[in-house]
A protein has these predicted regions:
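Conserved SAM/SAH cofactor-binding pocket of Class I
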Residues: 31-115, 120-123
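Generic structural signal for residues in well-ordered beta-strands
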Residues: 13, 91-93, 161
Length: 173
């Protein structure tokens, strides 16, 4: 079932109770990234889900915001939220795989990479029976190494990588 939530910044987001809905991690990450974005920077959110992070960063100084998402249904939700808020000139949602960013973007094309990656290693923890939710929570379609590799490819020299990682995952970085 779809719902439309109003965000603190006044924008609206379309969410689906059958899919992964955003949580406090995305809000905190957006706040952290917001403060560090400089005027005119190009920002990409890897694994954007329903597009919450680009929506929360809309009033930042970024020149452009891009969300990359592998799940087609999430791409649709995110794109409809962008359209609902008349933000098509600022936010672009791309359907694609983090492991294939070179097929979608030129090397070094972003100043900032933001991501709230799956926080569970695939074999750990109980997986949700919903594939959509499991993909968002567990390293099923990508892992932290894939995300770091994508960020390395996408970031300009001296670019910024803003992410949320559980403490027990920090050793991978």
């Amino acid at each position: 079932m779809e719902i439309v939530d109003t965000l603190k910044n006044g924008y609206k987001i379309i969410q689906d109770s059958e899919r992964f809905k955003f949580g406090i991690d995305a809000v905190m990450l957006s706040h952290f990234a917001f403060e560090k974005i400089r005027n005119g920077e190009n920002v990409i959110d890897l694994g954007t889900g329903n597009g919450i992070i680009p929506l929360l960063l809309t009033k930042s100084r970024a020149k452009s915001l891009t969300g990359l998402e592998i799940q087609a249904e999430n791409v649709d939700l995110a794109q409809r939220s962008v359209t609902l808020n008349n933000l098509s000139d600022k936010i672009q949602i791309i359907h694609g795989d983090i492991k294939s960013v070179s097929e979608k973007f030129p090397k070094h094309s972003f100043d900032v990479v933001v991501t709230n990656p799956p926080y569970m290693i695939n074999e750990h923890g109980k997986q949700n029976p919903s594939d959509a939710k499991s993909i968002a929570r567990h390293e099923i379609l990508c892992n932290l190494e894939d995300i770091i590799s994508a960020a390395d490819y996408l970031l300009k020299p001296c670019g910024k990588f803003r992410h949320h990682t559980l403490i027990n995952r920090a050793k991978v970085l």
